[in-house]
A protein has these predicted regions:
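Hydrophobic alpha-helical membrane-insertion segments
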Residues: 15-26, 167-186
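Membrane-interfacial helix-loop-helix
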Residues: 2-6, 13, 24-62, 101-158, ...
Length: 241
C-alpha cells in the first residue's frame, strides 16, 4: 500500500525533477554555447538566415527562448539580447516577453503539479506565522506577483516557483508575468538592438544598465505602486477599517 502511494507522488514530482535534471545538464553542456561570444561569432549567419527566413527565424527564436526559460537553462539574458539584435526593440521585446512568459508558465505548472497543491493545503491548515504569510499573499496576490517580477534582485526562477507553491491561479500568474517583465525586457532588448555597434567596436554590452539611476528609479517607482495596496490593506487591517 505504501509502495502504491509513493508512485503517484513520484509521478507528480517527475516534471519538476525533469526540469531540474535538464537544467543541471544544460548548465554543464551549454555554458559556452549560449554566451555573448557565441552570439558575436555567429551574428552574420544569424542575420543572413533572418533576412532570408524571417518568420521561421522568429518562430525558432521564440521556441528556443521558451525552452531556455522553461528548463532553466543558462542564457536567458543572452536570448533577450539576441531578440533585440535580430528583431529590434519592436517586435523583439514582444517576442522576448511572450517566450519568457510561456517558459515561466511551464515551470509554474510543473512545480504546482508536483508540490503546489499539497504545500498550499498544509499552509492553509497550519497556524501562526506560516498561516499569516499565506493569508497575506492570498489577500494581495496581484500586488505580490507584480512586485516579485519588477524587483531586479529577485531571480526569475524564484519568481516562477513561489507563486506555484502558494497555489496562485494560472491566469493571474500568466498576466502578472507578461506585464511585470515588460520593463526589464524592454531595457535588455534595447541593449540587444544596439549590439551591431558593440560588435563593430569589439566591446561587450553593459548588462548592468538596469541598475543605472535613470532606469532603476522608474522601476522602483513601479515597485512602490505594486506594494502600495499591500501597505494600505495592512493599515486598514490594524485600524479595523
Amino acid at each position: 500500500m505504501a509502495e502504491t502511494s509513493k508512485k503517484p507522488r513520484l509521478m507528480r514530482l517527475a516534471p519538476i525533477l525533469g526540469i531540474g535534471l535538464v537544467a543541471l545538464i544544460g548548465a554543464i553542456l551549454l555554458r559556452d554555447t549560449l554566451s555573448f561570444d557565441a552570439l558575436a561569432e555567429n551574428r552574420e549567419a544569424l542575420t543572413a538566415f533572418r533576412d532570408a527566413h524571417y518568420v521561421v527565424t522568429a518562430a525558432a527564436f521564440m521556441l528556443a527562448y521558451t525552452a531556455i526559460v522553461g528548463f532553466s537553462l543558462p542564457g536567458a539574458t543572452i536570448a533577450t539580447l539576441t531578440g533585440g539584435f535580430l528583431f529590434g526593440i519592436f517586435p523583439g521585446a514582444l517576442f522576448n516577453v511572450l517566450a519568457a512568459t510561456l517558459g515561466a508558465t511551464l515551470i509554474f505548472l510543473a512545480a504546482r503539479y508536483g508540490l503546489g497543491d499539497r504545500l498550499s493545503r498544509r499552509m492553509d491548515a497550519s497556524e501562526g506565522m506560516v498561516r499569516k504569510i499565506k493569508t497575506g499573499i492570498d489577500e494581495n496576490q496581484w500586488s505580490m506577483l507584480f512586485l516579485i517580477r519588477l524587483v531586479p534582485a529577485v531571480p526569475f526562477f524564484v519568481a516562477n516557483l513561489v507563486p506555484a507553491l502558494v497555489n496562485v491561479p494560472l491566469y493571474r500568474f500568466f498576466v502578472s508575468t507578461a506585464l511585470g517583465i515588460v520593463p526589464g525586457a524592454v531595457v535588455y532588448t534595447s541593449v540587444g538592438a544596439g549590439l551591431g555597434e558593440v560588435f563593430a567596436k569589439g566591446e561587450t554590452p553593459n548588462l548592468g544598465i538596469i541598475f543605472e539611476p535613470h532606469i532603476l528609479l522608474p522601476i522602483l517607482g513601479l515597485c512602490a505602486l505594486a506594494i502600495l495596496p499591500v501597505i494600505l490593506n495592512a493599515v486598514r487591517g490594524k485600524k479595523g477599517i
